[in-house]
Amino acid sequence: MSTFINPDFLLGNKFARELYHESAENLPIIDYHCHLIPQQVAENHKFADITEVWLGGDHYKWRALRGNGVDEDYITGGRSSREKFEKWAETVPYTMRNPLYHWTHLELARVFGIYDILKPETADYIYNRCNELLASDDFRAQSLMKKFNVETVCTTDDPTDTLEWHKRIAEKPFGVNVLPTWRPDKMLGIDDPENFRKYVAKLSGITGIMISGYQDALDALQKRHDFFGQMGCRLSDHGMDTFYAEDCTREEADRIFRKAMQGQMPDCKEIAKFKSAILLDLAAMDCKSGWTQQFHIGPIRNNNRKMFERLGPDTGFDAIDDKPVAAAGHKFFSKLAYEDNLGKTILYNLNPKDTEVMATMAYTFNDGKTAGKMQYGAAWWFLDQEDGMRKQLNALSSLGLLSRFVGMLTDSRSFLSYPRHEYFRRILCSMLGDDIQSGRLPESELPFIHKMVGDICYRNAKEYFQF
């Protein structure tokens, strides 16, 4: 058994160890942004094997496997579960210094009690042991969530989703709150008129509202927004390449909407105008309902045409975009603030060039009424690793108030990803412990720093989202 994942992993001094073990380690988890499948939660899904629960749908691992020269047949193809796992075990040693190496061994330790290093020599034992445990009811979906002391999760849901699985969970509670998140990205897809028309027809069908113009679409969205609120929704989310803040009248938005609904492609300026208009209207809905809006900014998606046609989206072929965000972002939030339509907001950047940009953008629009109203969010996606977390925490500390931060989230499709909260907590305590050790923070203020750790890891999120 390896001592790699030990009680003091990443905790380099006595202050870091004290902060983590006394004020972070045992706190509940609020996972306010994830991509779990609600049906699997509602049905208390039993996983067939470790390959399904660990490798299925995990584009982080898929990218690493491809980078290690593993054929696609062992990744998304028809090879057996054991063969796919063996290829992952062969790849893990080559992921050293990639966050996958830490995540892999934290998950093995925390979920399965396995402290061995995963490599070809240990693959058989680990595969068999994990599958033996997964055959037990103690390793079904709901049990895994309770195992990690998860208090609340927020899934990611389209406005046309029925939320039937959330309803079923609420009717048969199991100790974890599972709430929907409003993600209306498809209503911004006016640059693909064919699919946009199909989506509007779907929205019309579920609301019973005949949608012929822009105001009809807003009425239908408001009806679904109200329904999401009734189902416990407290957050919205937008995944975008950049911000949009073009001036657009209601009449212009209606004309552009009707143009797309007739199957015509709007020009680039019209696309930007429409996206700007609907984002402002959606933000106003969120503000009125007291929700928190999230903006995940900066991916360029589906870049490998051959593989996109073969596998579809979200399969490991996205990357970091380099569009400017500052001017449009500030103009967008300035409009909302001027019209008193700016509610709680979290900003996430994917391109590290935008780290300080986003941190300062957030703190330009606080109103002096709600502590931490505008948040610079956790390191996201390609930046969700130790270096990225430290840079995000340092930027927030230098340009805002770390003490008001709402903390970590998994952004994951996997029920095994909750150790990412532990990883964040250890890194946070390591940084603060180093500051105390070096004299940058006063040891005399340890009681407040302990409180600050607990706030960041749990209490701030609970209060901020009103869970």
Give the predicted meaning of each segment:
Residues S2-S289, N341-G343, L347-P352, E356-A359, ...:
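Metal-cofactor-binding active-site regions of metalloenzymes
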Residues P299, N304:
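Hard-cation-handling environments
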Residues D322-G329:
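Divalent-cation-assisted or electrostatically stabilized phosphate/pyrophosphate-binding catalytic cores
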Residues E270, G316-A319:
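Metal/cofactor-centered catalytic core regions of large enzymes
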Residues F332-Y338:
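Short, basic/hydrophobic alpha-helical segments
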Residues Q293-F295:
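C-terminal amphipathic alpha-helical interaction region
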Residues F308-G316:
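Short glycine/proline- and charge-enriched loop/turn segments
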